[in-house]
Amino acid sequence: MKAILPFAVMCVGMFVALLDIQIVASSLQDIGGGLSAAQDQISWVQTSYLIAEIIVIPLSGWLTRVFSTRWLFTGSAVGFTLASMLCGLAWNIDSMILFRALQGLLGASMIPTVFTSSFHYFQGNKRVYAAAVIGTIASIAPTLGPVIGGYITDAFNWHWLFYINLLPGTLVAIFVAILVKIDEPDVSLLKEADYPGIFLMAIGLGTLEYFLEEGTRWNWFSDNTITACAWISGVSLLAFIIRSMIVKNPVVDFRAFGNRNFALGCFLSFTTGIGIFSTIYLTPLFLGYVRGLSAWQTGVAIFSTGAASIAGVPVYIALARKYDLRWIMMFGLACFGLAMWSFSFITSDWGGDQLLWPQIIRGFPQVFCVAPSVTLGLGSLAPARLKYASGLFNMMRNLGGAVGIAVCGAMLNARTNFHFAALAGHLNAGNGAMTGLLRGLTGRLSRGLGSPVAGHQAALRELWRMTYAQAQTLAYSDAFRAIMLAFVIATCLVPLMRKVTPARAAPADAH
């Protein structure tokens, strides 16, 4: 009980922080309308949070050594809660963007800290349970975000997307301060910190996240700002990596990549991030833009993914106690790839009923993808490197999500145009099916509008809309196939990892 209670409290904090990544995803239009924001400003409600979060996550190992797990987590929970309150009180879009950045900045440390704490609180086979809990939270929280966000916005208003964090955030801060006693702070590390390295990393990751999040909207390298961000990110991150390899006390230890399991684990975490976040991005987008469903209807339609994720947890625990984690992870990755293949048969008529089984196949194996990667990727590292490595490991999952969403967004634009041009080429007088459809639409709409000319024009618009919807649907199918390919590659790489046997006891200096 001494281990379970503090770990459970920290998991609540991690869940809330991960939930807030996607809780606004289905309600951005409501937030933008409430704050009188322009269309090109609304996405910054999401982007500002992600930029701030991805900067802090790799620093969490160093921050834990400076302030201790107890006080870093407590401070993160307090800061996250206060920033959530400010988000709810935001008076315009600029204040909302600032407060969302603070929310991501202050709450980011709660995520990787839980990963390292699990290795302190649990040894031997008990780590299977801890990894299962972490894997479930890491996969289900972003999935439930749009569902919960859509319900709250429809039932109350968008302000409550942030106010719901106040009670759990306060309780987490109080109980972590009381219960968590893992290590002691060492503020002397502040004197020896590599501040130039921190600056390079912040600039590099911040501009990289902006490049990935905003590139599609601004047509990538045709925009000067996007091009500048790409160059700044590349140069800054290269300089940061080189500096981290030569300074005495780096804030991020890249030497952990010399461990085969950790390097492969990071790649698999990256791929899992692509799958989880990209599908969360694609499915609501399809239901909203192609099917025209509301935020709440979209949430209901994708709820089966979250339910299936929870159902997979006890199955994973039972299997993980008996079988090699590598084969379990291969099963999870292969099932996720199979789900993406089933999604590729999507049509413009698909709704909750048609999405049910593909989403169950996608949701059930999520814990099989995430939980083994924690044990296999981090479990083979020396205790002294574990804290630093956890930040990198978590950053790779978030970075995978950012890359996946960016690539899928670019694919949707490019492939929609490609498919529309291909379909439009068949819309001519020689196509009997098309002319029959147009004739029927014209007759029906003419009767409603009272004019053959108006009816014909309305029929042409409807034909264009139907064609564009089909082109969009084919583009979504292409995006799901691309994700499937990433999971096929990841599945093939798992056997290269070494088997990890859970330790029976934690070293005294592990944290």
Language-model-derived ranges and their functions:
Residues 2-61, 65-70, 84, 95-96, ...:
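Transmembrane core module of solute transporters
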Residues 26, 57-198, 214, 223:
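Helix-loop-helix hairpins in multi-pass membrane proteins, especially solute transporters
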Residues 41, 126-133, 385-392, 475:
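Cytoplasmic loop-to-transmembrane helix junctions
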Residues 22, 88, 104-112, 141-143, ...:
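Small-residue-rich segments within alpha-helical transmembrane domains of MFS-like 12-TM solute carriers
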Residues 166-185, 202-214, 232-246, 491-498:
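C-terminal membrane-cytosol helix-exit motif in multi-pass small-molecule transporters
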Residues 133-137, 268, 392-396:
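Hydrophobic alpha-helical segments of secondary membrane carriers
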Residues 141-146, 355-440:
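Small-residue-rich alpha-helical segments with characteristic i,i+4
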Residues 27, 41, 171, 398-489, ...:
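Hydrophobic transmembrane architecture of multi-pass small-molecule transporters
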